[in-house]
Amino acid sequence: IFNGFIPSEICLSPADCNANIEVDKDYEFAQPKTAVNREKALWDPSFNADFTKGKGNLSYAHMQPHGGRLARWSSTYQATEAQVGNRGPEIAGVDAAGGKLAAKVKDPNSVTFLNHGPRESWEGNIGYADAHVDYVTTLLGDDPKVWDRYEGRAGLTFDCYFYDEPDDVNKRNIFMSIFTKAGPESKDWTAIWD
Protein backbone atom coordinates (compact mmCIF):
# COMPACT_ATOMS: atom_id res chain seq x y z
CA ILE A 1 0.00 0.00 0.00
CA PHE A 2 2.71 2.45 1.09
CA ASN A 3 4.55 2.17 -2.24
CA GLY A 4 1.34 2.52 -4.23
CA PHE A 5 1.32 -1.01 -5.68
CA ILE A 6 -2.20 -1.61 -4.35
CA PRO A 7 -4.85 0.66 -2.84
CA SER A 8 -6.05 -0.08 0.71
CA GLU A 9 -9.48 -0.99 -0.72
CA ILE A 10 -8.04 -4.20 -2.19
CA CYS A 11 -7.26 -5.43 1.34
CA LEU A 12 -11.00 -5.83 2.02
CA SER A 13 -12.64 -8.74 0.23
CA PRO A 14 -16.01 -7.79 -1.29
CA ALA A 15 -17.31 -11.12 0.06
CA ASP A 16 -16.09 -10.58 3.65
CA CYS A 17 -18.86 -11.00 6.25
CA ASN A 18 -16.87 -9.89 9.30
CA ALA A 19 -18.28 -6.50 10.38
CA ASN A 20 -14.99 -5.71 12.17
CA ILE A 21 -13.04 -5.55 8.90
CA GLU A 22 -13.23 -2.32 6.92
CA VAL A 23 -11.23 -0.29 4.41
CA ASP A 24 -8.52 1.94 5.90
CA LYS A 25 -9.77 5.21 4.40
CA ASP A 26 -7.19 7.32 6.26
CA TYR A 27 -4.00 5.53 5.17
CA GLU A 28 -1.12 8.01 5.41
CA PHE A 29 1.52 7.69 2.69
CA ALA A 30 3.91 10.34 4.02
CA GLN A 31 5.08 10.79 7.60
CA PRO A 32 2.24 8.82 9.22
CA LYS A 33 1.19 10.24 12.61
CA THR A 34 1.28 6.85 14.37
CA ALA A 35 4.88 6.05 13.35
CA VAL A 36 7.60 6.13 16.00
CA ASN A 37 9.81 8.11 13.61
CA ARG A 38 7.55 9.78 11.05
CA GLU A 39 10.41 10.78 8.73
CA LYS A 40 11.73 7.20 8.46
CA ALA A 41 8.37 5.39 8.31
CA LEU A 42 8.06 2.74 5.60
CA TRP A 43 4.32 2.21 6.13
CA ASP A 44 1.38 3.55 8.12
CA PRO A 45 1.30 1.67 11.45
CA SER A 46 -2.38 2.56 11.88
CA PHE A 47 -3.22 0.02 9.14
CA ASN A 48 -4.46 -2.80 11.36
CA ALA A 49 -4.74 -6.49 10.54
CA ASP A 50 -6.19 -7.43 13.96
CA PHE A 51 -9.98 -7.54 13.75
CA THR A 52 -10.30 -9.31 17.14
CA LYS A 53 -9.73 -6.14 19.21
CA GLY A 54 -11.78 -3.60 17.28
CA LYS A 55 -11.65 -2.71 13.62
CA GLY A 56 -9.18 -4.36 11.26
CA ASN A 57 -8.27 -3.52 7.68
CA LEU A 58 -7.27 -6.88 6.18
CA SER A 59 -9.52 -9.68 4.89
CA TYR A 60 -6.90 -12.03 3.53
CA ALA A 61 -4.75 -14.73 5.09
CA HIS A 62 -1.15 -15.24 4.01
CA MET A 63 1.40 -17.97 4.50
CA GLN A 64 3.44 -17.55 7.67
CA PRO A 65 6.82 -16.13 6.58
CA HIS A 66 8.91 -18.11 9.05
CA GLY A 67 11.19 -21.13 9.31
CA GLY A 68 11.17 -23.46 6.31
CA ARG A 69 8.27 -21.47 4.86
CA LEU A 70 10.41 -18.34 4.49
CA ALA A 71 12.02 -19.70 1.31
CA ARG A 72 8.52 -20.02 -0.17
CA TRP A 73 8.09 -16.24 0.18
CA SER A 74 9.72 -15.68 -3.18
CA SER A 75 9.04 -16.28 -6.85
CA THR A 76 9.14 -20.07 -6.70
CA TYR A 77 6.56 -20.39 -9.51
CA GLN A 78 5.18 -23.53 -7.86
CA ALA A 79 1.54 -24.04 -8.83
CA THR A 80 0.75 -25.90 -5.58
CA GLU A 81 2.27 -23.38 -3.13
CA ALA A 82 -0.58 -21.34 -1.66
CA GLN A 83 0.63 -17.91 -0.54
CA VAL A 84 -2.44 -15.73 0.04
CA GLY A 85 -6.20 -16.14 0.01
CA ASN A 86 -9.53 -15.77 1.74
CA ARG A 87 -9.29 -16.41 5.48
CA GLY A 88 -10.19 -19.89 6.60
CA PRO A 89 -11.49 -21.29 9.87
CA GLU A 90 -9.23 -22.34 12.72
CA ILE A 91 -8.44 -26.04 12.36
CA ALA A 92 -8.30 -28.21 15.49
CA GLY A 93 -6.55 -31.07 13.72
CA VAL A 94 -6.51 -33.41 10.77
CA ASP A 95 -8.18 -36.80 11.07
CA ALA A 96 -7.22 -39.83 8.98
CA ALA A 97 -10.18 -42.01 9.97
CA GLY A 98 -11.51 -44.20 7.18
CA GLY A 99 -8.32 -43.82 5.15
CA LYS A 100 -9.13 -40.27 3.97
CA LEU A 101 -7.71 -37.10 5.51
CA ALA A 102 -10.27 -34.61 6.84
CA ALA A 103 -9.76 -31.24 8.53
CA LYS A 104 -11.56 -30.84 11.86
CA VAL A 105 -12.83 -27.28 12.25
CA LYS A 106 -12.51 -25.77 15.74
CA ASP A 107 -15.58 -23.50 15.42
CA PRO A 108 -18.43 -24.85 13.26
CA ASN A 109 -19.91 -21.32 13.25
CA SER A 110 -16.81 -19.65 11.77
CA VAL A 111 -17.57 -16.35 10.03
CA THR A 112 -15.40 -17.59 7.16
CA PHE A 113 -18.19 -20.04 6.20
CA LEU A 114 -20.39 -17.05 5.32
CA ASN A 115 -18.03 -15.55 2.73
CA HIS A 116 -18.48 -18.03 -0.15
CA GLY A 117 -20.40 -21.22 -0.87
CA PRO A 118 -22.62 -23.20 1.50
CA ARG A 119 -22.91 -21.97 5.10
CA GLU A 120 -21.64 -25.18 6.68
CA SER A 121 -18.28 -25.37 4.93
CA TRP A 122 -15.41 -23.19 3.74
CA GLU A 123 -14.80 -22.10 0.16
CA GLY A 124 -12.56 -19.32 -1.09
CA ASN A 125 -10.00 -17.92 -3.49
CA ILE A 126 -6.36 -18.94 -3.05
CA GLY A 127 -3.41 -17.27 -4.79
CA TYR A 128 -0.42 -19.46 -5.59
CA ALA A 129 3.31 -18.87 -6.15
CA ASP A 130 2.97 -19.12 -9.93
CA ALA A 131 0.55 -16.14 -9.84
CA HIS A 132 -2.63 -18.11 -10.57
CA VAL A 133 -5.73 -18.02 -8.37
CA ASP A 134 -8.12 -20.93 -7.82
CA TYR A 135 -11.54 -21.03 -6.24
CA VAL A 136 -11.07 -23.82 -3.70
CA THR A 137 -14.01 -25.79 -2.27
CA THR A 138 -12.26 -27.91 0.35
CA LEU A 139 -9.98 -27.42 3.35
CA LEU A 140 -7.87 -30.44 2.44
CA GLY A 141 -7.25 -31.68 -1.09
CA ASP A 142 -6.20 -35.10 -2.33
CA ASP A 143 -4.72 -34.49 -5.79
CA PRO A 144 -0.90 -34.03 -5.82
CA LYS A 145 -1.11 -32.18 -9.17
CA VAL A 146 -3.01 -29.30 -7.58
CA TRP A 147 -2.55 -29.63 -3.80
CA ASP A 148 0.64 -29.17 -1.81
CA ARG A 149 2.08 -31.94 0.36
CA TYR A 150 4.56 -31.73 3.21
CA GLU A 151 7.15 -34.17 4.56
CA GLY A 152 5.52 -35.70 7.63
CA ARG A 153 6.77 -38.50 9.86
CA ALA A 154 4.75 -40.95 7.73
CA GLY A 155 6.05 -39.53 4.42
CA LEU A 156 4.40 -37.08 2.02
CA THR A 157 1.05 -35.92 3.40
CA PHE A 158 -1.54 -33.53 1.95
CA ASP A 159 -1.41 -30.11 3.56
CA CYS A 160 -4.29 -28.24 5.20
CA TYR A 161 -3.67 -24.57 4.42
CA PHE A 162 -5.06 -23.23 7.71
CA TYR A 163 -3.31 -25.67 10.05
CA ASP A 164 0.31 -25.91 11.17
CA GLU A 165 0.76 -29.67 11.04
CA PRO A 166 2.86 -30.68 14.07
CA ASP A 167 4.47 -33.65 12.28
CA ASP A 168 6.00 -31.49 9.53
CA VAL A 169 9.66 -32.47 9.69
CA ASN A 170 11.00 -29.39 7.86
CA LYS A 171 8.40 -26.78 8.95
CA ARG A 172 7.68 -26.07 5.28
CA ASN A 173 3.98 -26.88 5.33
CA ILE A 174 1.66 -24.13 4.20
CA PHE A 175 0.14 -22.39 7.23
CA MET A 176 -2.07 -19.44 6.34
CA SER A 177 -3.73 -16.95 8.66
CA ILE A 178 -3.58 -13.31 9.63
CA PHE A 179 -0.71 -13.01 12.09
CA THR A 180 -0.71 -10.28 14.73
CA LYS A 181 2.52 -11.20 16.48
CA ALA A 182 5.81 -12.61 15.17
CA GLY A 183 8.92 -13.95 16.83
CA PRO A 184 12.04 -16.07 16.43
CA GLU A 185 10.16 -19.38 16.95
CA SER A 186 6.88 -20.60 15.45
CA LYS A 187 5.36 -20.73 18.93
CA ASP A 188 5.97 -16.97 19.27
CA TRP A 189 3.59 -16.18 16.39
CA THR A 190 -0.07 -15.36 17.01
CA ALA A 191 -2.63 -16.28 14.36
CA ILE A 192 -6.17 -14.88 14.58
CA TRP A 193 -9.39 -16.58 13.51
CA ASP A 194 -13.07 -15.77 13.22
Please give the residue ranges for each predicted region:
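Short, well-structured segments within or immediately adjacent to enzyme catalytic domains
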Residues: 1-194
